[in-house]
Design a protein with these regions (language model features):
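C-terminal motif of bacterial Sec signal peptides marking the signal peptidase cleavage site
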Residues: 19-23
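Short, solvent-exposed, Trp/other aromatic-anchored flexible loops in extracytoplasmic proteins
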Residues: 89-92, 109-159
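Contiguous beta-strand segments within globular domains
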Residues: 58-88, 95
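Bacterial signal peptide processing site
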Residues: 25-27
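Mid-length scaffold segments of soluble, non-membrane domains
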Residues: 85-111
Length: 173
């Protein structure tokens, strides 16, 4: 009787562990990609290629790639990595009143949208602000996409969309 109870408890613990680990894996690789023509039209209509803010001009520089470099633990996933730079083209420091909040990458009718993390590039000059997302969809490489970032004014809460068109998705080997 005692052995049967222990076996049942072990089975329950094993099932709980399987459920928990499965849900963590799903969250780790969840990607928000939608097909929404209204959202796409809104993004394009509100986007600019140069943002004028506090007497400075800003543009977006974007690097998109998938890392196929061998080494380290073997990965099943090769997500799209987006490294974006808000660049003050007047070479003045980026305003502390600007907050880069969201990324949109448009691949024909598909839109990947995601939050951005602080960039990891060393020695970025103060007229550039680097942000990163390393968990994008597994789209083909050597295709052109449009990249948009959403920027918020911390003073007025106004939101701006800044676009860079025809950015190539590179493959790192």
């Amino acid at each position: 009787m005692k052995n049967k109870l222990i076996a049942n408890l072990n089975l329950i613990m094993l099932l709980c562990l399987a459920i928990l680990s499965g849900s963590c894996e799903k969250d780790r690789y969840s990607v928000d990609v939608v097909t929404d023509s209204e959202m796409k039209a809104d993004i394009y209509s509100r986007s600019v290629d140069t943002l004028h803010f506090e007497s400075s001009r800003y543009i977006l520089e974007a690097e998109l790639y998938r890392d196929f470099f061998p080494g380290g633990p073997v990965q099943k996933e090769r997500p799209l990595i987006a490294s974006v730079y808000l660049v003050n083209i007047d070479s003045l420091p980026v305003s502390p009143n600007l907050d880069v909040q969201k990324l949109y990458v448009i691949n024909n009718d598909l839109i990947w949208y995601a939050a951005l993390n602080q960039g990891v590039q060393p020695n970025v000059p103060d007229f550039k602000l680097n942000k990163l997302n390393n968990n994008g969809p597994e789209w083909d490489t050597d295709i052109l996409v449009d990249v948009v970032i959403e920027i918020r004014s911390t003073q007025t809460n106004e939101r701006f969309l800044l676009m860079a068109k025809d950015i190539n998705i590179d493959a790192l080997w």
